Swiss-Prot record:
GO biological process terms on file: nitrogen fixation; phosphorelay signal transduction system; regulation of DNA-templated transcription
Assembly behavior: Interacts with sigma-54.
Gene: nifA
Protein's recorded name: Nif-specific regulatory protein
Pfam families referenced in this protein's UniProt entry, alphabetically: HTH_8 (PF02954)
Residue spans binding DNA: 101-129
Keywords: Activator, ATP-binding, DNA-binding, Nitrogen fixation, Nucleotide-binding, Transcription, Transcription regulation, Two-component regulatory system
Organism: Azotobacter chroococcum mcd 1
Record domain Sigma-54 factor interaction: where: 1-46
């Protein structure tokens, strides 16, 4: 409502959104923040001839395109495998724990402080998720 009023003021005309357009917007996974929603509404308003944002207009902005498929999850590595070196074992635990150090430490039977030390000494670069 707020964004619609703001965009309408910028364009100098009243804007409305159909129920089907709202449902489409609500069902979309917005990876960014409110600016992504605002940009989509601005593009939709510009493409709307009469100030009514419909599902078809929102679709033209690419909102209903399917998200790219996620990469297949890596198979879990047996952390007790004796063939793994220390670095591989720590990285495998981090991957299984979603790169959360405390969870990886639990998987390896370590304290968070111990795994942090291993990450530093083994020169493992932490992924930002």
């Amino acid at each position: 409502e707020f964004l619609l009023t703001k965009i309408g003021r910028q364009q100098g005309r009243p804007l409305t959104v159909t129920d089907s357009a709202i449902r489409l917007l609500m069902s979309h996974r917005w990876p960014g923040n409110v600016r992504d929603v605002e940009n989509c509404l601005e593009r939709s308003a510009i493409m709307s001839e009469d100030g009514t944002i419909t599902r078809d207009v929102v679709s033209l902005t690419g909102v209903d395109n399917e998200s790219p498929p996620l990469a297949a999850p890596l198979p879990e590595v047996n952390l007790a495998d004796e063939n793994l070196d220390d670095r591989e074992r720590v990285i495998a635990a981090l991957e299984q724990a979603g790169w959360v150090q405390a969870k990886a430490a639990r998987l390896l039977g370590m304290t968070p402080r111990q795994i942090a030390y291993r990450i530093q000494t083994l020169n493992i670069h932490m992924r930002k998720i």
